[in-house]
């Protein structure tokens, strides 16, 4: 690990204008030390919104939302082939560093308009979503459906 840290230190010092992102390399393979060099982490290559809700729930116990990248991906999802509404995919991704990894050219005009509105909404609430206090509600694992979250801006 120390060799990796030396490489990260060298990269970030040599190229301070580049935003580097750590990668979990399949999940659960990053540690707090990586955040000393890379300010954000890609938590998992599984971008299916329902799977990702569980992944992000787990990370929320130890990491702030401001460090874990989360993306709205194509539908059907390329890992699970699950078809999930665009709104659901956005709602999950918004509880992280929200991004999109889908071909907008494949979307209908109304979906592209929805993406534009989602990005505007995320920008409006970004301070709360990334830097607010995050409280866990009902667990996503209790068998009663989706978990609940409350976020409030600190200070």
Residue ranges of predicted features:
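Glycan-recognition surfaces
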Residues: 2-106
